[in-house]
């Protein structure tokens, strides 16, 4: 990812290859130019070409068997319940009451808890205990909630409904909503830094803090959001798939990526394992957004628990708008396959939650 965002008119979009996801190059470019380079999503293998085909087929069959026999709904309900209890404990109702009420209103409003579950599953995949990841998974959910509060504000998406309830600023006012988001953002880092078990080395905690900070700044969420805002009303002839990918690799995938990477770091994963988790999460992050865009034009507000069709009304750039509905569905299937490819070679039992999570994101209905 690049360290800055340049004006929309100066983008140069490179060709898209089916086996890559495009992200920004770290090399210095002229101020008016953003270059993109492909990152291969295919995990490195050490097997010979003569045996690779049979090995891949065997591994893929093992993954499919593991995924199909795994009760993901029971898993996610159980993990989400433990996350909800931890969040309730981490952010108690105290003085000043109004700000803590506003923080808790959005933080404890339910939701799928996909990011904390991803953090847990990644931690366990590399051999860590679930308890080690508790502060990290709470931190990513606090930051995710902050992003929702701010995203719903009149100056952003101007939304009235979130998770089936009035948005934070509709209940507490814009001023308190902004402060509630700010408070959740700062407390997320405090919680990650101070509540992580002493079993985790200080070096790994510092690394986790750095990853989380990067994911939400101008190399992550903020970059995606500002380009998204600037893209409203753009002529489709002037943008392409890579442009839309940039937005959502930063705005949506970055925090999912951080969730998986934090789990891998806290769980004691190797650099190779952490990078494979990063690429897996990057794929499901894009997948999440593609499906979200599809649902926005195919489901009602009641079914979604939030305002349906808002992107169409706001003239936002979306995958169905750029590619059409059927091509968007095909792209979602491709991303799910690429995500699964990153998990080849891991223990089939430990990898089951991540496989099921990818399928859940691909097939969700709200």
From Swiss-Prot:
First-level EC class: transferase
Keywords, ordered alphabetically: Carotenoid biosynthesis, Chloroplast, Chromoplast, Isoprene biosynthesis, Magnesium, Metal-binding, Plastid, Transferase, Transit peptide
Localization annotation: Plastid, Chloroplast stroma; Plastid, Chromoplast
Binding site for isopentenyl diphosphate: 112, 115, 144, 163
Required cofactor(s): Mg(2+)
Annotated disulfide bonds: none
Residues the record lists as binding Mg(2+) 2: 151, 157
UniProt-annotated stretches for the region Disordered: 44-65
Gene Ontology MF annotations: (2E,6E)-farnesyl diphosphate synthase activity; dimethylallyltranstransferase activity; geranylgeranyl diphosphate synthase activity; metal ion binding
Residues that bind Mg(2+) 1: 151, 157
Free-text cofactor note: Binds 2 Mg(2+) ions per subunit.
Pfam families: polyprenyl_synt
Summary of the function given for this chain in its UniProt record: Catalyzes the trans-addition of the three molecules of IPP onto DMAPP to form geranylgeranyl pyrophosphate.
Protein name, entry field: Geranylgeranyl pyrophosphate synthase, chloroplastic/chromoplastic
Organism annotation: Sinapis alba (White mustard)
Organism lineage: Eukaryota, Viridiplantae, Streptophyta, Embryophyta, Tracheophyta
């Amino acid at each position: 990812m690049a360290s800055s965002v340049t004006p929309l008119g100066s983008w140069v979009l490179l060709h898209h290859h089916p086996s890559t996801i495009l992200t920004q190059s770290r090399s210095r470019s002229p101020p008016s130019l953003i270059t993109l380079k492909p990152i291969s999503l295919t995990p490195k293998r050490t097997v010979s070409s003569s045996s690779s085909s049979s090995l891949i087929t065997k591994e893929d069959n093992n993954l499919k068997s593991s995924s199909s026999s795994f009760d993901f709904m029971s898993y996610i309900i159980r993990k989400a319940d433990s996350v909800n209890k931890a969040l309730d404990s981490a952010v108690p109702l105290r003085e000043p009451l109004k700000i803590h009420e506003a923080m808790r209103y959005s933080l404890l409003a339910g939701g799928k808890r996909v990011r904390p579950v991803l953090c847990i599953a990644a931690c366990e995949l590399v051999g860590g205990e679930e308890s080690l990841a508790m502060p990290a998974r709470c931190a990513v959910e606090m930051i995710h909630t902050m992003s929702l509060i701010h995203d719903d504000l009149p100056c952003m998406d101007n939304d009235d409904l979130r998770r089936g309830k009035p948005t934070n600023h509709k209940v507490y006012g814009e001023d308190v909503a902004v402060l509630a988001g700010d408070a959740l953002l700062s407390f997320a880092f405090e919680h990650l830094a101070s509540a992580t078990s002493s079993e985790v080395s200080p070096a790994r905690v510092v690394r986790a803090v750095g990853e989380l900070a990067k994911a939400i700044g101008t190399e992550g969420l903020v970059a995606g959001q500002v380009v998204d805002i600037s893209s409203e009303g753009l002529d489709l002839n002037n943008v392409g798939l890579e442009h839309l990918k940039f937005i959502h690799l930063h705005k949506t995938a970055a925090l999912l990526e951080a969730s998986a990477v934090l789990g891998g770091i806290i769980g004691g994963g190797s650099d190779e394992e952490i990078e494979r988790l990063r690429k897996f999460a990057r794929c499901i992050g894009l997948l999440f957004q593609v499906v979200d865009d599809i649902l926005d034009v195919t489901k009602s507000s009641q079914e979604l628990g939030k305002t349906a069709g808002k992107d169409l009304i706001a003239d936002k750039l979306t995958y169905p708008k750029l590619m059409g509905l059927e091509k968007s569905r095909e792209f979602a299937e491709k991303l799910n396959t690429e995500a699964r490819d990153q998990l080849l070679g891991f223990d089939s039992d430990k990898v089951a939650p991540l496989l099921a999570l990818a399928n859940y994101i691909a097939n969700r209905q709200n």
